[in-house]
């Protein structure tokens, strides 16, 4: 039952998990760790290309992990700098994202677009129907396992970077929200960028179009992560997963 409510919260169909009122451990109720600008930069420098693109996309867009790995090349418009988030993957099962906010186009910063173009050139799977981040072990027929990426690549990279925080995929989404607040972005624009669908969470109705105001706000917030220095560096190839 708790898992069902957790799934509903991840997709923002529910605001809270009532089961947690019975089990009130600090771990369940704590806010996820987020990275500072310098920590985020240090992490990027330790990641190989695939993982770096995944982290950049997660941090820039606030996509949930299931939405991130469900993306196919046909969902990304590299010219218009948009991602159409229409599906999500949970426990290897791909389904539609039916909420009002989740189906709206997501703006992509120029840096992310540049990294995606480079990744597409390198990836073995680059047709329109292919996943952006496919599992090599599954011959590209399934997306990569996000928890495996965390365990094998991102968390070891954090250790190498000297970052002692416990980071999960939701940390990047939470970090974007924090950076938006720190940069003084108005609540309506921030909620639209984070695509909160539940009225108890969003407090307002979303606009359909990706506006220039939202794009400027996203660029302002995301650039805050990159003020420390450049992300360009020689990358070792990722190991097949």
Regions of interest found by a model, annotated:
Residues 26, 34, 51, 89, ...:
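Catalytic-site neighborhood detector that most strongly recognizes the C-terminal catalytic loop/helix
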Residues 41-52, 61, 106, 120-131, ...:
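Short, basic (Lys/Arg/His-rich) helix/loop patches that form interaction surfaces
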Residues 10-71, 79, 101-103, 111-112, ...:
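Basic, Lys/Arg- and aromatic-enriched nucleic-acid-binding interface segment
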Residues 1-7, 22, 108:
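Non-catalytic DNA-binding core/recognition domains of DNA-processing enzymes
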Residues 2-5, 9, 210, 214:
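C-terminal flanking helix
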Residues 80, 91-114, 118, 124-127, ...:
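C-terminal secondary-structure termini that scaffold catalytic or DNA-interacting sites
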């Amino acid at each position: 039952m708790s898992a069902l409510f957790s799934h509903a919260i991840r997709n923002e169909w529910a605001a809270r998990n009532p089961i947690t009122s019975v089990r009130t451990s600090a771990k369940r109720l704590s806010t996820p760790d987020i990275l500072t600008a310098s920590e985020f930069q240090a992490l990027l420098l330790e990641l190989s290309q695939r993982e770096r693109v995944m982290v950049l996309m997660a941090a820039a867009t606030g996509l949930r992990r299931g939405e991130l790995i469900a993306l196919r090349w046909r969902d990304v418009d590299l010219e218009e700098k948009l991602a159409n988030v229409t599906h999500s993957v949970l426990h290897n099962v791909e389904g539609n994202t039916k909420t009002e906010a989740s189906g709206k186009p997501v703006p992509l910063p120029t840096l992310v677009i540049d990294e995606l173009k480079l990744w597409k050139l390198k990836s073995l799977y680059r047709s329109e129907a292919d996943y952006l981040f496919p599992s090599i072990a599954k011959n590209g027929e399934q997306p990569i396992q996000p928890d495996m990426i965390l365990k094998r690549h991102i968390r070891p990279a954090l250790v190498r970077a000297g970052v002692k925080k416990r980071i999960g995929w939701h940390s990047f989404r939470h970090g974007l929200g924090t950076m938006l607040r720190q940069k003084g972005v108005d609540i309506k624009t921030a909620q639209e960028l984070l695509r909160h669908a539940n009225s108890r969470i969003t407090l307002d109705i979303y606009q359909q179009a990706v506006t220039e105001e939202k794009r400027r706000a996203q660029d302002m917030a995301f650039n805050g992560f990159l003020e420390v220095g450049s992300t360009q560096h020689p990358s070792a190839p990722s190991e097949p997963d």
